[in-house]
């Protein structure tokens, strides 16, 4: 008999602010949450899930990133500031300020570099908070950042394509050009393929190894979410209320039929693949949180826990814990398992 995926509620609490972003500690025992009114909150899952406000950004907090295998995490906000925090004592310091909102943060896989997206500029800091380089000239505001696995290359999605920068001395940059506004940047786990969802309702792929590029059309709305399965076999994409999964086996997506995952009755607001394990989670304005296993014949598991629009989803590094937040500021932490 095939195992059946399960979602079990572990902790539920009221944050008191609209949840904008979140990040788990490497061991999954702590989660930090950015609030729309500026709060930075820490939730210990070993202490009954109490939310502790440890600091703030004026105007609103916008992004969080936790150092892989480390104790540091970064936050940014509408005040243009980037704060570097030590989770062992909640001390923080400002390592960067900008006159515009700072919306994008991402640590490299080895935790030694932090990428910061400010409008059209990309700043790179080391883990001590010292700025290493500034890369300007992106066409339009940076919409997403993603580090190539096991490398010092970071992709920045913007208008007209995705720019990939190898952080070295000097910085080596390459433009993967495509007309239109790129909204996402997602690396296949082996680093061989870069995918981006576009405003015009297409998905574009660049094979970094062969140089080949391809495009998938047919979406009825902008492709706002993309993500790879942990084994690199599937790329999930979401537009409007539907999810389309492309299989990257054999000849790649051109030689396979797309898998359509239909379960939402309103626009999908969040979609995320588990870093480990076969799971894909999606949530939407229909107040539904669905757990899928692309490539399996299961129907999705409906968490059936929410009465408001879900605006935040985040997996722990081991893929065993899932955090969801709704627009009223309620947080739910769930354990992902099988029966």
Label the model's feature ranges.
Residues 1-339:
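WD40-repeat beta-propeller superdomains and closely related acidic/aromatic-rich repeat-like regions
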């Amino acid at each position: 008999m095939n195992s059946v995926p399960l979602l079990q509620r572990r902790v539920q609490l009221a944050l008191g602010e609209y949840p904008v972003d979140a990040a788990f500690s490497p061991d999954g025992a702590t989660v930090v949450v950015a609030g729309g009114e500026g709060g930075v909150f820490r939730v210990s899952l070993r202490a009954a899930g109490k939310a502790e406000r440890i600091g703030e950004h004026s105007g609103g907090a916008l992004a969080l990133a936790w150092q892989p295998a480390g104790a540091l995490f970064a936050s940014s906000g509408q005040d243009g500031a980037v704060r570097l925090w030590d989770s062992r004592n909640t001390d923080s310091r400002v390592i960067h300020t900008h006159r515009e909102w700072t919306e994008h943060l991402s640590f490299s896989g080895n935790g030694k570099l932090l990428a910061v997206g400010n409008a059209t500029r990309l700043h790179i800091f080391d883990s001590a908070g010292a700025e290493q380089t500034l890369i300007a000239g992106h066409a339009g505001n940076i919409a997403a950042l993603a580090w190539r696995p096991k490398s010092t290359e970071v992709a920045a999605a913007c208008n007209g394509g995705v720019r990939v920068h190898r952080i070295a001395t000097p910085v080596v940059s390459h433009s993967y050009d495509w007309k239109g506004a790129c909204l996402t940047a997602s690396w296949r786990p082996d680093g061989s393929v870069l995918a981006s969802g576009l405003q015009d309702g297409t998905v574009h792929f660049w094979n970094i190894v062969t140089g080949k590029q391809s495009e998938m059309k047919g979406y009825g709305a902008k492709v706002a979410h993309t993500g790879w399965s942990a084994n690199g076999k599937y790329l999930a994409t979401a537009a409007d209320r539907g999810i389309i999964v492309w299989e990257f086996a054999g000849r790649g997506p051109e030689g396979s039929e797309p898998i359509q995952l239909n379960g939402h009755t309103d626009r999908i607001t969040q979609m995320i693949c588990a870093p480990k394990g076969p799971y894909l989670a999606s949530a939407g304005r229909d107040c539904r949180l669905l757990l899928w296993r692309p490539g399996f014949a299961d129907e999705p598991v409906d968490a059936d826990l929410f009465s408001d629009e879900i605006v935040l989803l985040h997996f722990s590094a081991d893929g065993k814990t899932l955090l969801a937040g709704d627009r009223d500021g309620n947080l739910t932490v769930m354990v992902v398992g099988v029966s």
